[in-house]
Amino acid sequence: MRLCDTDIERYLDDGIISLTPRPNNDKINGATIDVRLGNSFRVFREHSAPFIDLSGPKEEVSAQLESVMSDEILIPEGEAFFLHPGTLALATTLESVKLPANIIGWLDGRSSLARLGLMVHVTAHRIDPGWEGKIVLEFYNSGKLPLALRPNMVIGALSFEVLSGEAKRPYSSRKDAKYKNQQSAVASRIDEDKE
């Protein structure tokens, strides 16, 4: 069952779901709560590797990933990060999210941004039960013009569903959880996948 705005407010008030900093109640609408853009970004370096062999030896995949990803880029308040057409970039939400073992979250981009060509979360929009940390956004500009993205702008909306019971292996307790407690635009850790 997806939570309505009344339940989202109650779950936040009772500490069942946590968003830090907590958005004002006027950012809770119908069945979602708005989240804002943080200031941490990472981009792919131009032409630094001919390809990434996703099923190759882990050491080679690690080296390839390291060679293509930039260091963290921190955008000062009031300044903009420019996402050019055909470009993929990683960023984070301003808010850190904490979910219990019986709630799953979903992140959706804003329709107004999609109409400009901005994909906010390319494929991975599920926030697992037991998640704790900022949400990394996978931005892609499929439009024709560069887009200026500024920290603190509303970038998407979270919704929540109560599971039929508590997850047996919530994200926070998994030893193989690659992005546990992430607070910055963490690059892919596909090289840490178990076989």
UniProtKB/Swiss-Prot annotation:
| Pathway participation | Pyrimidine metabolism; dUMP biosynthesis; dUMP from dCTP (dUTP route): step 1/2
Spell out the subunit comment. Homotrimer.
Pfam families per the UniProt record, alphabetical: DCD
Record region (Disordered)? 169-195
The UniProt function text for this chain reads:
Catalyzes the deamination of dCTP to dUTP.
Origin species, per record, is: Haemophilus influenzae (strain PittEE)
Catalytic activities: dCTP + H2O + H(+) = dUTP + NH4(+)
Q: Name one GO biological process term.
A: dUMP biosynthetic process
Gene3D superfamilies, sorted: 2.70.40.10
Q: What is this protein called?
A: dCTP deaminase
Tell me which residues bind dCTP: R110, S111, S112, L113, A114, R115, D128, V136, L137, E138, Y171, K178, Q182
The alphabetized UniProt keywords are: Hydrolase, Nucleotide metabolism, Nucleotide-binding
Presence of the UniProt keyword Nucleotide-binding in the record: yes
Q: Which family would the database say this protein is a member of? A: Belongs to the dCTP deaminase family.
- EC numbers: 3.5.4.13
Q: Which HAMAP family match?
A: dCTP_deaminase
